[in-house]
Regions:
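Short acidic (Asp/Glu) and glycine-rich catalytic loops that position anionic groups and cofactors
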Residues: 24-25, 40-47, 54-61, 98-104, ...
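A structural supersecondary motif
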Residues: 30-35, 44-54, 69-111, 130-134
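Structured segments of extracytoplasmic/periplasmic soluble domains
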Residues: 70, 74, 83, 123-131, ...
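C-terminal regions of mature proteins
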Residues: 1-40, 45-51, 139-277
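Long, C-terminal catalytic modules of enzymes
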Residues: 95-102, 114, 118, 129, ...
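Short, conserved charged micro-motifs
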Residues: 56-60, 112-119, 222-226
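Short amphipathic alpha-helices in soluble, non-transmembrane regions
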Residues: 1-3, 117-125
Length: 277
């Protein structure tokens, strides 16, 4: 007979420090150049993350970010991959890290510089505003319903459901019905709401515009590519130069910036009581 003894000791809250996320200053584009670890890698890559500040109701904010990621995904891919053929990887979507949300755009290219890739993302985001505002009601509702159906889709594997619950546990939020809460907010969102959200967080003129651009340069030769128009290219570069802050020491940068509060854990204590497994 085999017996196993487990010795338990008391753990203090200080043993589990809450992760804190750097809050970017509004109105700035931060760029960070990551070193290329593979000397034979010809591709350059960039990730631009539009940080979404925590000022809306938690679930409404999540719903707006998810819906924007849904509607922008196909036009972004069509423009930069299909039409401009910028590279192997063209992706956009939402992100969430310890309660702080974002909208991300990722490009990987073996023929364009990271500066050019950054300019194309900024230009796309600016030009997409008019496309979003002119979207007809039927197309908007189709995108919204597709997102709702995806959110409410039952897990195909036990591991999917397990991972979803463990994600809430490891973050210490314990809101196991978060999908239903987000869907309830999605049903309320109108196109006008989404455009207002876009103006505030995605446009350079928005009051809550803040972006982090992480870049790495490949070792392959890059050709000089031309933008859609010289006028648009010049406008983008002018706005970039006046708002861009280069991060040279990432650790020093993190220690010099304000942090978001431990919002997700604090707000979810009251919700945890009503959450159902």
């Amino acid at each position: 007979m085999i017996s196993i003894q487990i010795h338990l000791s008391h753990r203090y809250a200080s043993d589990y420090p809450d992760p804190r996320i750097v809050r970017l200053d509004r109105g700035h584009l931060y760029t960070f150049e990551r070193p290329q670890v593979n000397k034979d890698q010809p591709c350059s890559a960039i990730q631009m993350m539009y940080q979404i500040d925590l000022e809306y109701d938690e679930w409404r904010l999540q719903a707006l970010v998810s819906l924007l990621a849904q509607v922008v995904q196909e036009p972004f891919y069509d423009k930069l991959r299909t039409k401009e053929q910028l590279g192997y990887l063209v992706w956009s979507g939402s992100s969430e890290m310890w309660g702080v949300l974002g909208v991300r755009f990722i490009l990987q290219s073996d023929k364009a510089t990271v500066e050019y890739l950054q300019q194309r993302i900024l230009t796309f985001v600016r030009n997409y505003r008019s496309i979003l505002a002119s979207m007809d009601k039927e197309k908007f509702e189709k995108n919204r319903e597709a997102l709702i159906a995806n959110k409410l889709q039952k897990p195909k594997k036990l591991s999917e459901e397990t991972n979803r619950y463990w994600n809430q546990i490891t973050k210490r939020t314990y809101v196991f019905d978060h999908r239903e809460l987000e869907v309830a907010e999605l049903r309320k969102i109108t196109l006008k709401d989404l455009v207002a959200f876009y103006d505030k967080f995605m446009m350079e003129s928005g009051s809550e515009w803040r972006v982090l651009s992480s870049r790495t340069t490949g070792n392959g030769s890059k050709v000089t590519l031309k933008a859609d128009s010289e006028k648009d290219d010049g406008e983008t570069k002018k706005q970039e130069s006046s708002r861009t802050i280069e991060i040279k020491d990432f650790e020093a940068f993190k220690h010099s910036m304000p942090l978001y509060p431990v919002r997700a854990y604090l707000k979810s204590k009251s919700a945890a009581a009503s959450a159902k497994l």
